[in-house]
């Protein structure tokens, strides 16, 4: 019930709600999702047609045997192998089923709305916001619907002609030092190196900027086909953030996520 109270709290956004239900009810998908849906390849057979890197890297295979700092990492032989593997996720989703379903996008929009509506108390609407690993851009779209006009996304593979997300690497941002007001990601389990990624995100944030991560829970059984790292305890990730940031603004746990908002990067 608390989820729905948050969902329908004050300050409604008509544009957000209209687009949310268009995503749910439009046959064949709405907006950019419709373009992705058209890319479904009914002749594609995964076991026959999958990329060679997927023979090594899948849900149960391609992982290192030992843990490091509470983390299990994929056994990539090079950064190029990592990039190749990560770029395949969207391609496979589109070929096999046309990307996310209408209900998936509807559900993601509601979850992002609950997350991001809190930000209006902390940031001006012209804040510089970067969403890392944004794929088709649902989180960017919701931020803009909430009034954050300078929200943008990056992804290794954002799909063709994506109006919301540019090609970019969350491990190696193009953004200058001290330039972002907020950085958001819900794909930190796709990092090549978690500590290096946090340091890179900290670098690009302004001294009093915010970092918002969705941290996957219930990962004791390991990651899925495309996760690059997994952890048994979310605390191991949160502690890494506390070493880099001065203040925890908010922590909230959901069934699949622990979302953590921190502010104020530590001086090196």
Please annotate each region the language model reported:
Residues 128-172:
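Class I SAM-dependent methyltransferase SAM/SAH-binding core
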Residues 218, 223-252:
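Conserved Class I S-adenosyl-L-methionine
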Residues 171-183:
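A short acidic, Gly/Pro-enriched loop at the edge of an enzyme's catalytic core
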């Amino acid at each position: 019930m608390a989820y729905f109270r948050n969902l329908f709290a004050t300050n409604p956004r008509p544009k957000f709600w209209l687009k949310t239900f268009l995503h749910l009810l439009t046959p064949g998908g709405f907006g950019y999702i419709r373009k992705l849906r058209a890319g479904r390849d009914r002749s594609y057979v995964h076991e026959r047609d999958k990329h060679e890197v997927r023979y090594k890297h899948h849900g149960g295979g391609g992982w290192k045997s030992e843990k490091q700092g509470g983390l299990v990492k994929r056994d990539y032989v090079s950064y190029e192998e990592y990039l190749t593997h990560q770029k395949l996720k969207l391609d496979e989703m589109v070929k096999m089923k046309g990307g996310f379903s209408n209900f998936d996008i509807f559900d993601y929009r509601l979850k992002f709305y609950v997350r991001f509506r809190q930000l209006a108390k902390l940031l001006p609407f012209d804040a510089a916001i970067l969403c890392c690993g944004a794929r088709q851009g649902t989180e960017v779209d919701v931020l803009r619907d909430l009034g954050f006009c300078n929200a943008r996304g990056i992804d290794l593979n954002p799909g063709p002609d994506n109006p919301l997300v540019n090609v970019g690497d969350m491990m190696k941002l193009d953004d200058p030092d001290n330039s972002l007001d907020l950085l958001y990601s819900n794909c930190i389990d796709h990092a090549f190196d978690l500590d290096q990624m946090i340091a890179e995100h900290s670098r690009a944030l302004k001294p009093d900027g915010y970092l918002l991560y969705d941290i996957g829970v219930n990962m004791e059984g390991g990651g899925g086909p495309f996760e690059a790292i997994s952890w048994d305890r979310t605390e191991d990730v949160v502690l890494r953030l506390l070493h880099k940031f001065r203040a925890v603004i908010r922590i909230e746990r959901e069934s699949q996520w622990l979302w953590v908002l921190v502010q104020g990067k530590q001086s090196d």
